[in-house]
């Protein structure tokens, strides 16, 4: 469910990527991009950026670079970028609402012993407008809370003292508005799910909740503060250990789900999941007989984890064999964008120098780099896969973006050095990305079918579960690829380059 939410929110970056890509296309169409890159490369070379000579005041920007920058900042380019930012903000509000609908409906279903994935899908279809409305209201509260501080800051032009005082008052007033508003809306989403009411009724129930059940409300606030404190502490610990990317897994996939299930359970007055077959629990002799089965020991946690990843590898192979066209479509988009990236940067004359000590590029024992690579690549794969829920647009964008980056780097790097630094792990990592993109297109077909009536929520839920199974298999592949990239690729590249 939370990976589904990640897929929905992945749509936010689509307009930004399109805006940047469109701007680069405009600049490349009339040679302005080539001039800008050439001037900046010359400026960087003269300033000896790699040597750190700009640590002090630094050299002045040469007239050629200043002119190239001025030529690049035109109304169409600025319009594209501003439009991309505005579109991203709007999509962010909508995507957050849809993500909340999916996760809270899924949690409520899990508490009732129903299928959480199917409930998430049907819940989004039923209550999307209420959750998007709540998301818009939350964003409006933040904007409203910022207004007093902005008005206070505007007085700095008249008097610094008055501006400082007014800004401080504005921050307190605006912060109070935001806090009170968010507290009032705390259980609105849970009310939509549990009470099956609209946005108006949900807001009313959420406002009444602290009055009717003050102990539960205060308890939830304390739990929330504890979860965010734990997340902050974990982030600090991960940063000290050099594996800050783990926060991207622990937060969205462990702590936030815990907070959501506490919220829904409190509101629904349930404390633990109730199995679907509780109503049919045997009694008497039948119960005694069933106890014999129940006493069969379950496999240990480690065995279950190993079995899950082994099953993921089986699912990975089955998906590639069963849906090769989806994987090939992802690979084709990647290759198309890579070719465009080479064309875009190959004629600029710029060149990225290789590291002087290739074999030490990640350090002697790059455990932190290894963890970073595994987490980052798996999250990229999960986003591409579950981005298919938005009709595959984020999945296609991810394939195009990754291909463009690889092609653009190839166009400005020494080809032999680039291949030596990419090929050893790329033979595993790139196919894994293609499979993730193929998963996204596979889910997109199901999502499109649901919208047109050709696919049921149950079938789409099965595709989402299959994607999770395949992602576990991809995790194994990406761990091996990261081991090669962190520990072997630098040494292989050093041997190739001499």
Locations of the language-model features?
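Hydrophobic alpha-helical membrane segments
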Residues: 1-340
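Membrane-helix interface motif
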Residues: 30-46, 145-158, 343-354, 402-412, ...
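Membrane-interfacial helix-loop connectors
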Residues: 75, 79, 375-430
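Transmembrane alpha-helical segments in integral membrane proteins
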Residues: 85-108, 183-186, 380-404, 435, ...
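Membrane-interfacial helix-loop-helix connectors in multipass membrane proteins
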Residues: 149-174, 236-247, 351-358, 409-422, ...
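Hydrophobic alpha-helical transmembrane segments and adjacent short intramembrane/lumenal linkers
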Residues: 171, 187, 410-475
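Final/C-terminal transmembrane alpha-helix of multipass membrane proteins
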Residues: 328-332, 467-491
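Transmembrane helical segments that form the transport core of multi-pass membrane transport proteins
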Residues: 340-397
